[in-house]
Regions:
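N-terminal active-site segment of His-dependent metallophosphoesterases
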Residues: 1-56, 77-83, 157-159
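A short acidic, amphipathic alpha-helical/loop segment
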Residues: 53-57, 112-115
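Internal catalytic-core helix/loop-beta-alpha segment
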Residues: 94-130
């Protein structure tokens, strides 16, 4: 699990890499940026579309540092279905975090997430699927965060990934546009 012995953590966020269906590889700039910033962990919100890409993240950052969920486009991979859960939850420095892929189109994604999951006990909801970066505290007081997609222009004209810097007193999300 996640070690919170440090004062704060820097978590790299990526989703919907869609390799090889949309592109031939994860953009090197993301892997380099995560390494250069010495991320503590990487969260991937699904749609690898290939076990090879999941394994690339494991090889690059280490099995104990990569946490991922299955996406709708991963369902065809029995290997990914066998190892990736539909959701993850963490308590980091007292902040309760829920991670899932998501379903449906971009409009009303927050409502759909709340209908398909009981999010009442979480402070931060991190999701993928809609390809659009999303960083918003909603009227329920929860942070909804989506790093977008680094490779696919469906539903968006911006490719992106992100970071979450978190400590007892701080929650700082950041979206990076490519």
């Amino acid at each position: 699990m996640i070690n919170t012995n440090k004062e704060e953590l820097l978590i790299g966020l990526v989703s919907d890499t869609h390799v090889p269906t949309r592109t031939d590889k994860v953009p090197e700039v993301i892997l380099k940026d995560f390494k250069d910033k010495n991320v503590d962990y990487v969260f991937h919100m699904g749609d690898f579309t290939s076990i090879d890409i999941y394994e690339q993240f494991i090889e690059t950052f280490g099995k104990d540092k990569v946490f991922a969920v299955i996406g709708n486009m991963d369902a065809g991979s029995s290997e990914l279905k066998d190892i990736l859960p539909e959701s993850l939850e963490f308590d980091l420095y007292g902040h309760k975090i829920f991670i899932t892929h998501g379903t449906g189109g971009p409009s009303m994604i927050v409502r759909r997430l709340n209908k398909s999951h009981d999010l009442s006990k979480y402070d931060i909801i991190i999701f993928g699927h809609v390809h659009r970066p999303y960083n918003e505290v909603w009227r329920d007081g929860k942070l909804y965060l989506n790093p977008g997609t680094p490779t696919d222009k469906r539903f968006t004209d911006i490719n992106s990934y992100g970071y979450l810097r978190i400590s007892k007193d701080k929650v700082e999300p950041e979206i990076i546009h490519l």
